[in-house]
Design a protein with these regions (language model features):
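Bacterial N-terminal signal peptides
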Residues: 1-8
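Noncatalytic, solvent-exposed loop/strand surfaces
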Residues: 13-484
Length: 484
Protein backbone atom coordinates (compact mmCIF):
# COMPACT_ATOMS: atom_id res chain seq x y z
CA UNK A 1 0.00 0.00 0.00
CA UNK A 2 1.27 3.49 -0.78
CA UNK A 3 1.85 5.31 2.47
CA UNK A 4 3.22 8.73 3.35
CA UNK A 5 6.75 7.83 4.41
CA UNK A 6 9.32 10.39 3.26
CA UNK A 7 6.93 11.76 0.68
CA UNK A 8 3.24 12.61 0.93
CA UNK A 9 2.22 11.89 -2.61
CA UNK A 10 -0.79 10.00 -3.87
CA UNK A 11 -2.97 8.29 -1.29
CA UNK A 12 -4.62 5.19 -2.72
CA UNK A 13 -5.59 1.62 -2.08
CA UNK A 14 -3.77 0.52 -5.24
CA UNK A 15 -0.60 -1.51 -4.72
CA UNK A 16 2.66 0.20 -5.61
CA UNK A 17 3.37 -2.57 -8.12
CA UNK A 18 0.24 -1.73 -10.16
CA UNK A 19 0.76 2.00 -10.65
CA UNK A 20 3.33 4.48 -11.94
CA UNK A 21 1.08 7.51 -11.62
CA UNK A 22 3.32 10.46 -12.46
CA UNK A 23 6.84 11.52 -13.39
CA UNK A 24 9.28 9.03 -11.80
CA UNK A 25 6.60 6.84 -10.28
CA UNK A 26 4.54 6.44 -7.09
CA UNK A 27 6.88 8.40 -4.82
CA UNK A 28 8.45 10.44 -7.62
CA UNK A 29 11.78 8.80 -6.86
CA UNK A 30 12.09 6.39 -9.78
CA UNK A 31 12.22 3.17 -7.79
CA UNK A 32 10.31 -0.12 -7.98
CA UNK A 33 12.16 -2.13 -5.31
CA UNK A 34 9.98 -5.25 -5.25
CA UNK A 35 9.72 -5.77 -9.01
CA UNK A 36 11.96 -7.61 -11.45
CA UNK A 37 12.01 -7.26 -15.22
CA UNK A 38 13.55 -9.76 -17.67
CA UNK A 39 17.31 -9.36 -17.90
CA UNK A 40 17.39 -10.15 -21.61
CA UNK A 41 14.59 -8.04 -23.10
CA UNK A 42 15.13 -6.67 -26.60
CA UNK A 43 13.24 -5.70 -29.74
CA UNK A 44 12.81 -9.39 -30.58
CA UNK A 45 12.74 -10.94 -27.10
CA UNK A 46 10.25 -10.45 -24.25
CA UNK A 47 8.46 -7.79 -26.32
CA UNK A 48 4.76 -7.82 -25.35
CA UNK A 49 3.67 -5.05 -27.70
CA UNK A 50 4.92 -2.02 -29.58
CA UNK A 51 2.66 0.76 -30.83
CA UNK A 52 3.24 3.98 -32.78
CA UNK A 53 2.85 7.22 -30.83
CA UNK A 54 2.46 10.86 -31.85
CA UNK A 55 5.38 13.23 -31.47
CA UNK A 56 6.10 14.06 -27.85
CA UNK A 57 8.62 13.53 -25.08
CA UNK A 58 6.37 12.95 -22.07
CA UNK A 59 6.85 9.76 -20.09
CA UNK A 60 4.06 7.20 -19.64
CA UNK A 61 1.88 7.50 -16.55
CA UNK A 62 0.14 4.27 -15.46
CA UNK A 63 -2.83 3.45 -13.26
CA UNK A 64 -3.47 -0.29 -13.13
CA UNK A 65 -4.45 -1.29 -16.67
CA UNK A 66 -4.45 2.20 -18.18
CA UNK A 67 -1.53 4.14 -19.61
CA UNK A 68 -1.68 7.91 -20.17
CA UNK A 69 0.58 9.80 -22.56
CA UNK A 70 0.56 13.11 -24.39
CA UNK A 71 1.63 14.12 -27.88
CA UNK A 72 0.92 16.50 -30.71
CA UNK A 73 0.74 17.07 -34.43
CA UNK A 74 0.87 20.38 -36.30
CA UNK A 75 -2.70 21.28 -35.35
CA UNK A 76 -3.48 19.74 -31.97
CA UNK A 77 -2.22 18.71 -28.57
CA UNK A 78 -3.20 15.11 -27.85
CA UNK A 79 -3.84 13.29 -24.59
CA UNK A 80 -4.32 9.57 -24.90
CA UNK A 81 -5.32 6.56 -22.79
CA UNK A 82 -4.05 3.09 -23.73
CA UNK A 83 -4.84 -0.43 -22.59
CA UNK A 84 -1.72 -1.47 -20.68
CA UNK A 85 -2.10 -5.14 -21.61
CA UNK A 86 -2.47 -4.67 -25.36
CA UNK A 87 -1.40 -1.11 -26.26
CA UNK A 88 -4.86 -0.51 -27.75
CA UNK A 89 -6.06 3.11 -27.72
CA UNK A 90 -9.00 3.34 -25.30
CA UNK A 91 -9.63 7.03 -25.88
CA UNK A 92 -7.94 10.05 -27.37
CA UNK A 93 -8.74 13.74 -27.04
CA UNK A 94 -7.20 16.90 -28.41
CA UNK A 95 -6.95 20.65 -27.99
CA UNK A 96 -5.95 23.14 -30.70
CA UNK A 97 -2.40 24.46 -31.01
CA UNK A 98 -2.67 28.21 -31.42
CA UNK A 99 0.93 28.78 -32.47
CA UNK A 100 3.57 26.52 -34.01
CA UNK A 101 6.85 27.22 -32.23
CA UNK A 102 10.37 26.71 -33.51
CA UNK A 103 12.58 25.89 -30.54
CA UNK A 104 16.26 26.65 -30.07
CA UNK A 105 17.03 23.02 -29.22
CA UNK A 106 16.14 19.76 -30.94
CA UNK A 107 14.80 18.42 -27.63
CA UNK A 108 12.27 21.25 -27.46
CA UNK A 109 8.73 19.90 -27.67
CA UNK A 110 5.26 21.28 -26.82
CA UNK A 111 4.24 18.05 -25.06
CA UNK A 112 7.09 17.33 -22.66
CA UNK A 113 5.04 17.15 -19.47
CA UNK A 114 4.23 13.71 -18.06
CA UNK A 115 0.56 13.22 -16.99
CA UNK A 116 -0.28 12.64 -13.33
CA UNK A 117 -3.19 10.72 -11.80
CA UNK A 118 -4.53 9.71 -8.40
CA UNK A 119 -6.75 6.97 -9.83
CA UNK A 120 -9.80 9.22 -10.12
CA UNK A 121 -8.54 12.30 -11.95
CA UNK A 122 -5.86 12.55 -14.64
CA UNK A 123 -3.93 15.80 -15.05
CA UNK A 124 -2.51 16.76 -18.45
CA UNK A 125 -0.44 19.91 -18.91
CA UNK A 126 0.55 21.76 -22.08
CA UNK A 127 2.35 25.05 -21.52
CA UNK A 128 0.79 26.57 -24.64
CA UNK A 129 -2.68 25.67 -23.42
CA UNK A 130 -2.95 24.95 -19.70
CA UNK A 131 -4.11 22.24 -17.33
CA UNK A 132 -6.72 19.67 -18.40
CA UNK A 133 -8.31 17.35 -15.84
CA UNK A 134 -10.33 14.29 -16.88
CA UNK A 135 -11.55 11.13 -15.23
CA UNK A 136 -9.97 7.83 -16.22
CA UNK A 137 -12.46 7.46 -19.08
CA UNK A 138 -11.60 10.83 -20.61
CA UNK A 139 -14.60 12.79 -19.32
CA UNK A 140 -13.62 16.41 -18.72
CA UNK A 141 -13.58 17.49 -15.08
CA UNK A 142 -12.11 20.98 -15.44
CA UNK A 143 -9.56 23.13 -17.25
CA UNK A 144 -7.25 25.85 -15.98
CA UNK A 145 -5.90 28.05 -18.77
CA UNK A 146 -2.46 29.65 -18.26
CA UNK A 147 -0.35 32.20 -20.10
CA UNK A 148 2.44 30.34 -21.94
CA UNK A 149 5.94 30.68 -20.56
CA UNK A 150 7.20 30.56 -24.15
CA UNK A 151 10.72 29.36 -23.37
CA UNK A 152 12.89 29.08 -26.48
CA UNK A 153 13.90 25.61 -25.22
CA UNK A 154 10.24 24.65 -24.58
CA UNK A 155 8.65 23.75 -21.24
CA UNK A 156 9.99 20.65 -19.52
CA UNK A 157 8.54 20.24 -16.01
CA UNK A 158 5.64 17.94 -15.13
CA UNK A 159 2.55 18.55 -12.97
CA UNK A 160 2.60 16.76 -9.63
CA UNK A 161 -0.34 15.53 -7.55
CA UNK A 162 -0.10 15.46 -3.77
CA UNK A 163 -2.83 15.50 -1.09
CA UNK A 164 -5.60 16.53 -3.51
CA UNK A 165 -3.49 19.38 -4.87
CA UNK A 166 -1.77 19.93 -8.21
CA UNK A 167 1.62 21.66 -8.25
CA UNK A 168 3.03 23.27 -11.39
CA UNK A 169 6.38 24.96 -12.01
CA UNK A 170 5.70 28.31 -13.73
CA UNK A 171 9.25 29.70 -13.61
CA UNK A 172 10.02 32.35 -16.21
CA UNK A 173 6.45 33.22 -17.16
CA UNK A 174 4.74 36.56 -16.68
CA UNK A 175 3.34 34.96 -13.53
CA UNK A 176 6.65 33.32 -12.58
CA UNK A 177 5.67 31.17 -9.63
CA UNK A 178 4.97 27.79 -8.11
CA UNK A 179 1.26 27.27 -8.75
CA UNK A 180 -1.00 25.18 -6.50
CA UNK A 181 -4.46 24.14 -7.74
CA UNK A 182 -7.30 22.19 -6.14
CA UNK A 183 -7.24 18.73 -7.74
CA UNK A 184 -11.02 18.38 -7.73
CA UNK A 185 -12.00 21.84 -9.02
CA UNK A 186 -8.96 23.37 -10.73
CA UNK A 187 -9.28 26.53 -8.64
CA UNK A 188 -6.10 28.25 -7.51
CA UNK A 189 -5.31 27.61 -3.84
CA UNK A 190 -2.10 29.64 -3.77
CA UNK A 191 0.74 30.89 -5.93
CA UNK A 192 4.26 31.38 -4.56
CA UNK A 193 5.81 34.20 -6.56
CA UNK A 194 9.26 33.56 -8.02
CA UNK A 195 10.23 36.88 -9.63
CA UNK A 196 13.37 37.03 -11.79
CA UNK A 197 13.48 33.24 -12.16
CA UNK A 198 14.28 32.00 -15.65
CA UNK A 199 12.49 28.94 -17.06
CA UNK A 200 13.62 25.60 -15.66
CA UNK A 201 12.70 21.98 -16.38
CA UNK A 202 12.60 21.07 -12.69
CA UNK A 203 9.37 19.36 -11.58
CA UNK A 204 8.07 20.17 -8.07
CA UNK A 205 8.90 17.53 -5.48
CA UNK A 206 6.65 16.82 -2.46
CA UNK A 207 8.40 15.95 0.77
CA UNK A 208 7.45 15.55 4.41
CA UNK A 209 9.70 17.24 6.99
CA UNK A 210 8.55 16.43 10.50
CA UNK A 211 4.91 17.47 10.60
CA UNK A 212 5.27 19.82 7.63
CA UNK A 213 4.30 18.99 4.07
CA UNK A 214 6.75 20.73 1.75
CA UNK A 215 7.09 21.26 -1.99
CA UNK A 216 10.64 21.59 -3.31
CA UNK A 217 11.27 23.54 -6.50
CA UNK A 218 14.65 24.36 -8.03
CA UNK A 219 15.75 26.99 -10.51
CA UNK A 220 17.94 30.06 -11.11
CA UNK A 221 20.64 28.94 -8.69
CA UNK A 222 18.31 28.04 -5.81
CA UNK A 223 16.37 25.20 -4.27
CA UNK A 224 13.39 26.41 -2.24
CA UNK A 225 11.12 24.43 0.07
CA UNK A 226 7.59 25.81 0.30
CA UNK A 227 4.75 24.94 2.62
CA UNK A 228 2.29 22.80 0.67
CA UNK A 229 -0.51 24.36 2.71
CA UNK A 230 -0.05 28.04 1.85
CA UNK A 231 3.09 28.47 -0.30
CA UNK A 232 5.14 30.07 2.46
CA UNK A 233 8.90 29.75 1.91
CA UNK A 234 10.35 27.49 4.63
CA UNK A 235 13.99 27.10 3.63
CA UNK A 236 16.30 27.58 0.69
CA UNK A 237 19.74 26.61 -0.59
CA UNK A 238 21.82 28.73 -2.97
CA UNK A 239 24.92 28.17 -5.12
CA UNK A 240 23.23 25.85 -7.62
CA UNK A 241 23.05 25.95 -11.46
CA UNK A 242 21.25 28.92 -12.99
CA UNK A 243 19.48 26.79 -15.59
CA UNK A 244 18.44 23.39 -14.32
CA UNK A 245 16.73 20.37 -15.86
CA UNK A 246 16.97 17.67 -13.15
CA UNK A 247 14.40 17.45 -10.35
CA UNK A 248 15.25 16.98 -6.66
CA UNK A 249 14.79 13.75 -4.76
CA UNK A 250 14.93 12.90 -1.04
CA UNK A 251 15.65 9.81 1.05
CA UNK A 252 16.50 9.28 4.73
CA UNK A 253 16.64 12.99 5.47
CA UNK A 254 18.91 13.96 2.57
CA UNK A 255 17.79 15.94 -0.49
CA UNK A 256 19.93 15.55 -3.61
CA UNK A 257 19.73 18.27 -6.24
CA UNK A 258 21.87 20.05 -8.82
CA UNK A 259 23.10 19.61 -12.35
CA UNK A 260 25.21 20.96 -15.17
CA UNK A 261 24.73 23.70 -17.77
CA UNK A 262 26.94 25.33 -20.42
CA UNK A 263 26.15 28.67 -18.75
CA UNK A 264 28.84 27.91 -16.16
CA UNK A 265 31.72 26.99 -18.46
CA UNK A 266 33.56 29.13 -21.01
CA UNK A 267 36.36 29.10 -23.57
CA UNK A 268 38.01 25.74 -24.24
CA UNK A 269 35.90 23.95 -21.64
CA UNK A 270 32.68 25.18 -23.21
CA UNK A 271 33.77 24.16 -26.71
CA UNK A 272 34.72 20.67 -25.55
CA UNK A 273 31.45 20.31 -23.64
CA UNK A 274 29.29 20.72 -26.75
CA UNK A 275 30.90 17.83 -28.64
CA UNK A 276 30.48 14.13 -27.97
CA UNK A 277 33.56 12.28 -26.78
CA UNK A 278 33.32 9.98 -29.78
CA UNK A 279 32.83 12.76 -32.34
CA UNK A 280 35.15 13.34 -35.30
CA UNK A 281 35.91 16.93 -34.28
CA UNK A 282 39.69 17.37 -34.35
CA UNK A 283 41.61 18.76 -31.40
CA UNK A 284 42.57 21.73 -33.56
CA UNK A 285 38.91 22.42 -34.37
CA UNK A 286 38.11 22.43 -30.65
CA UNK A 287 40.63 25.24 -30.16
CA UNK A 288 40.13 27.35 -33.27
CA UNK A 289 36.78 28.30 -34.91
CA UNK A 290 38.53 28.80 -38.26
CA UNK A 291 39.87 25.25 -38.10
CA UNK A 292 36.35 24.05 -37.29
CA UNK A 293 35.00 25.73 -40.43
CA UNK A 294 37.86 24.30 -42.47
CA UNK A 295 36.99 20.81 -41.23
CA UNK A 296 33.22 20.89 -41.68
CA UNK A 297 32.40 23.54 -44.31
CA UNK A 298 32.19 20.93 -47.07
CA UNK A 299 31.16 23.29 -49.88
CA UNK A 300 33.51 26.07 -48.69
CA UNK A 301 30.82 28.74 -48.78
CA UNK A 302 31.89 30.21 -45.42
CA UNK A 303 28.75 29.04 -43.67
CA UNK A 304 27.63 25.80 -42.07
CA UNK A 305 24.29 24.15 -42.70
CA UNK A 306 22.62 21.81 -40.23
CA UNK A 307 23.71 18.85 -42.37
CA UNK A 308 27.34 19.96 -42.24
CA UNK A 309 27.43 20.12 -38.44
CA UNK A 310 28.80 17.02 -36.66
CA UNK A 311 26.51 15.23 -34.20
CA UNK A 312 26.84 17.21 -30.98
CA UNK A 313 25.16 19.49 -28.49
CA UNK A 314 26.03 22.28 -30.90
CA UNK A 315 24.02 20.61 -33.65
CA UNK A 316 21.15 19.99 -31.21
CA UNK A 317 21.13 23.73 -30.44
CA UNK A 318 21.65 24.82 -34.07
CA UNK A 319 18.69 27.21 -33.96
CA UNK A 320 20.14 28.87 -30.85
CA UNK A 321 23.51 29.44 -32.55
CA UNK A 322 21.87 30.58 -35.81
CA UNK A 323 20.88 33.93 -34.33
CA UNK A 324 19.52 35.45 -37.55
CA UNK A 325 17.50 32.29 -38.32
CA UNK A 326 18.66 32.06 -41.94
CA UNK A 327 19.36 28.33 -41.74
CA UNK A 328 23.15 28.71 -41.64
CA UNK A 329 25.81 29.39 -39.02
CA UNK A 330 28.44 31.93 -40.04
CA UNK A 331 31.76 32.66 -38.34
CA UNK A 332 30.38 35.64 -36.41
CA UNK A 333 27.75 33.34 -34.88
CA UNK A 334 30.15 30.47 -34.16
CA UNK A 335 33.33 32.17 -32.90
CA UNK A 336 31.84 33.57 -29.64
CA UNK A 337 31.58 30.00 -28.34
CA UNK A 338 35.38 29.95 -28.11
CA UNK A 339 35.76 33.13 -26.06
CA UNK A 340 36.13 33.34 -22.30
CA UNK A 341 32.70 34.79 -21.73
CA UNK A 342 31.72 35.60 -18.14
CA UNK A 343 29.91 32.72 -16.53
CA UNK A 344 26.30 33.18 -15.53
CA UNK A 345 25.59 33.41 -11.78
CA UNK A 346 25.53 29.98 -10.19
CA UNK A 347 27.71 26.92 -10.65
CA UNK A 348 27.68 23.36 -11.89
CA UNK A 349 27.30 21.16 -8.82
CA UNK A 350 25.27 18.39 -7.18
CA UNK A 351 24.48 18.89 -3.50
CA UNK A 352 23.49 16.59 -0.66
CA UNK A 353 21.33 18.67 1.70
CA UNK A 354 20.13 17.65 5.15
CA UNK A 355 16.44 18.37 5.60
CA UNK A 356 15.29 20.62 8.42
CA UNK A 357 15.78 24.20 9.44
CA UNK A 358 14.39 27.48 8.17
CA UNK A 359 15.69 30.34 6.06
CA UNK A 360 18.92 29.98 4.10
CA UNK A 361 20.30 26.59 5.13
CA UNK A 362 23.21 26.51 2.66
CA UNK A 363 25.96 26.82 5.26
CA UNK A 364 24.28 24.74 7.94
CA UNK A 365 22.74 21.85 6.00
CA UNK A 366 24.81 21.13 2.89
CA UNK A 367 26.47 17.79 3.65
CA UNK A 368 28.48 17.38 0.48
CA UNK A 369 28.95 18.61 -3.06
CA UNK A 370 29.98 16.87 -6.24
CA UNK A 371 31.46 18.62 -9.28
CA UNK A 372 32.26 15.77 -11.67
CA UNK A 373 29.99 13.46 -13.66
CA UNK A 374 27.02 15.83 -13.36
CA UNK A 375 23.82 15.27 -15.37
CA UNK A 376 22.49 17.88 -17.76
CA UNK A 377 18.89 16.61 -17.82
CA UNK A 378 18.55 13.25 -16.02
CA UNK A 379 17.45 13.56 -12.39
CA UNK A 380 19.52 11.91 -9.64
CA UNK A 381 18.43 8.49 -8.42
CA UNK A 382 18.67 7.52 -4.73
CA UNK A 383 18.58 3.78 -4.13
CA UNK A 384 19.75 1.73 -1.15
CA UNK A 385 21.47 4.79 0.36
CA UNK A 386 23.44 5.44 -2.79
CA UNK A 387 23.08 8.25 -5.34
CA UNK A 388 23.34 7.38 -9.03
CA UNK A 389 23.93 9.95 -11.78
CA UNK A 390 23.79 9.49 -15.57
CA UNK A 391 25.67 12.14 -17.54
CA UNK A 392 26.36 13.12 -21.15
CA UNK A 393 28.84 10.87 -22.86
CA UNK A 394 27.51 7.78 -21.11
CA UNK A 395 29.20 8.33 -17.75
CA UNK A 396 27.76 6.81 -14.57
CA UNK A 397 28.61 7.99 -11.07
CA UNK A 398 27.64 6.45 -7.72
CA UNK A 399 28.21 8.13 -4.34
CA UNK A 400 27.19 7.49 -0.76
CA UNK A 401 23.99 9.34 0.16
CA UNK A 402 25.08 10.70 3.55
CA UNK A 403 28.64 11.71 2.67
CA UNK A 404 28.92 12.06 -1.11
CA UNK A 405 31.89 9.68 -1.01
CA UNK A 406 32.29 8.13 -4.48
CA UNK A 407 31.91 4.40 -4.93
CA UNK A 408 32.66 4.96 -8.59
CA UNK A 409 32.85 8.09 -10.71
CA UNK A 410 32.44 8.67 -14.45
CA UNK A 411 32.43 4.99 -15.37
CA UNK A 412 31.71 4.52 -19.07
CA UNK A 413 28.58 2.83 -20.37
CA UNK A 414 30.08 2.65 -23.84
CA UNK A 415 27.47 4.76 -25.63
CA UNK A 416 28.02 8.51 -25.92
CA UNK A 417 25.69 11.42 -26.55
CA UNK A 418 23.01 12.80 -24.27
CA UNK A 419 21.13 11.05 -21.47
CA UNK A 420 17.76 12.76 -21.18
CA UNK A 421 15.80 9.98 -19.46
CA UNK A 422 16.22 9.76 -15.69
CA UNK A 423 17.60 6.45 -14.38
CA UNK A 424 15.21 4.22 -12.46
CA UNK A 425 15.74 1.28 -10.09
CA UNK A 426 13.94 -2.05 -10.45
CA UNK A 427 14.72 -4.78 -7.93
CA UNK A 428 18.48 -5.33 -7.97
CA UNK A 429 19.07 -3.34 -11.14
CA UNK A 430 19.09 0.15 -12.62
CA UNK A 431 17.69 1.05 -16.02
CA UNK A 432 19.53 3.79 -17.88
CA UNK A 433 18.50 5.00 -21.35
CA UNK A 434 20.78 6.75 -23.81
CA UNK A 435 19.34 9.33 -26.18
CA UNK A 436 20.76 7.26 -29.03
CA UNK A 437 18.32 4.45 -28.20
CA UNK A 438 20.39 2.09 -26.06
CA UNK A 439 18.82 0.75 -22.86
CA UNK A 440 21.20 -0.48 -20.15
CA UNK A 441 20.46 -2.86 -17.30
CA UNK A 442 23.05 -2.19 -14.58
CA UNK A 443 23.60 -3.82 -11.21
CA UNK A 444 22.43 -1.63 -8.33
CA UNK A 445 25.67 -1.96 -6.41
CA UNK A 446 28.80 -0.10 -5.35
CA UNK A 447 30.57 -1.37 -8.45
CA UNK A 448 29.49 -0.53 -11.98
CA UNK A 449 28.49 -3.69 -13.82
CA UNK A 450 26.46 -3.76 -17.03
CA UNK A 451 24.18 -6.80 -17.11
CA UNK A 452 22.43 -6.28 -20.44
CA UNK A 453 22.15 -3.76 -23.28
CA UNK A 454 19.50 -3.51 -25.96
CA UNK A 455 19.07 -0.97 -28.74
CA UNK A 456 15.61 0.30 -29.68
CA UNK A 457 17.13 2.13 -32.68
CA UNK A 458 15.07 5.23 -31.92
CA UNK A 459 15.96 8.26 -29.87
CA UNK A 460 14.83 8.25 -26.24
CA UNK A 461 13.81 11.35 -24.29
CA UNK A 462 11.24 9.91 -21.86
CA UNK A 463 11.86 8.17 -18.54
CA UNK A 464 10.69 4.52 -18.42
CA UNK A 465 7.85 3.27 -16.21
CA UNK A 466 7.61 -0.11 -14.46
CA UNK A 467 4.36 -1.84 -13.44
CA UNK A 468 3.75 -5.51 -12.58
CA UNK A 469 7.36 -6.36 -13.48
CA UNK A 470 6.88 -5.01 -16.98
CA UNK A 471 8.82 -2.05 -18.36
CA UNK A 472 7.29 0.62 -20.59
CA UNK A 473 9.67 2.73 -22.67
CA UNK A 474 8.67 5.60 -24.93
CA UNK A 475 11.02 6.26 -27.83
CA UNK A 476 10.76 8.88 -30.55
CA UNK A 477 8.02 7.09 -32.50
CA UNK A 478 6.81 4.18 -30.36
CA UNK A 479 5.79 3.00 -26.92
CA UNK A 480 7.22 -0.40 -26.00
CA UNK A 481 6.09 -2.96 -23.42
CA UNK A 482 8.59 -5.61 -22.31
CA UNK A 483 8.09 -8.44 -19.82
CA UNK A 484 7.36 -12.10 -19.31
Amino acid sequence: IITALSNFLISSNASAESIWPQFRGPNMNGIAPSQAIPKDFSTNNKLIWKIPTPKGHSSPSIWKNKIFITGHNKKNFKFICLNRNTGEVLWEQKRPISKIRIYDHVAGDPSNSTPATNGDIVIFYFDDYGVIATDLNGKLKWEHIVAPISSSFSYGASPIISNDKVFINRDGGIDSSLLCLDLNTGKKIWSAKRPNFIPSFCSPYPMQQGNKNLILTGGSGKLIAYSAINGEEIWSTIGLPSFVCPSPVESNGVVVFGGWTTAHVSGQNRVESVFDEDSNVSEKSKKDPIAFFNQFDADKDQKLSLLEFPASRAKDAFNYIDTNRDGFVIMDEWAPLYTNQPNAPGRNVMLGIATGGTGDITKSNVLWELKKGLPYVASPLIYRNRVYLAAKGGFMTCVELKTGKPFYQKERLGVGGEYYASPIAVGDHLIVCAHRGNVFLIKASKKMEIVHVTNLKEKIYATPAVVDSKIYIRSADHLWSFGE
